Amino acid sequence: SLSMYKVVREPVTPDYLDEEELQRIIEFDSPIERLVITRDMFLFGCFTGLSYIDIKTLTNEHFETDKEGRRWIKKRRVKTNVLSRIPVLPMAQSILDKYSGGKTLLPLQDCTDTNRNIKNIVTLCGIDKKVTFHTSRHTFATTVTLANDVPLEIVSQMMK
């Protein structure tokens, strides 16, 4: 029986991209359209903190504008049902604008394909880290929120 074995897991420090690495991804370009789309979807994750499934299920109904004219994403996380209120930063807005008019809000590819494309992009950008779509969430929680003065209570609420 396996019950006599104890699984010892090393605590995993989730990788995130620092500002310089994030800048490399922002500046990445390719003649291969699917890589450009993947870059944009990954950056949307970096600038909203939304997970893959939360981006996939994002609709226009999740957006609201406050009295000051700032746009917010108000959405429950699929995984935890926790309600998040996320500021729509300029980078996220420009990605939404770029893909507006499509069949879906954002052209997110299959998760496996997306992660394979991310691996290629990261390699082409000379970044030596194991990066998946989930890395974008941690990049938001660290690098992006610091650079954009996103209040800590918003970040901690979103990371639940």
Task: Label every PLM stretch briefly.
Residues H62-G69, D128-K129, D149-K160:
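Short, polar N-cap/turn motifs at the start of nucleic acid-interacting alpha helices
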Residues R24-P31, E61, S94, T123-I127:
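Conserved helix-loop functional segments at active or binding sites
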Residues P11-V12, R77-N120, G126:
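C-terminal catalytic core of Y-nucleophile DNA break-rejoin enzymes
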Residues L43, F47, I53-D54, R137-K160:
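C-terminal catalytic core of tyrosine-transesterase DNA break-rejoin enzymes
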Residues L2-Y52, R70, D110, N148:
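Basic, Lys/Arg- and aromatic-enriched nucleic-acid-binding interface segment
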Residues W72-K75, K129-V131:
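A short linear hydrophobic-aromatic micro-motif
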Residues N60, K119, T123, L146, ...:
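Residue-level detection of the helix-turn-helix DNA-binding "recognition helix"
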Residues I37-M41, C111-T112, D128-N148:
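Short basic/aromatic active-site micro-motif
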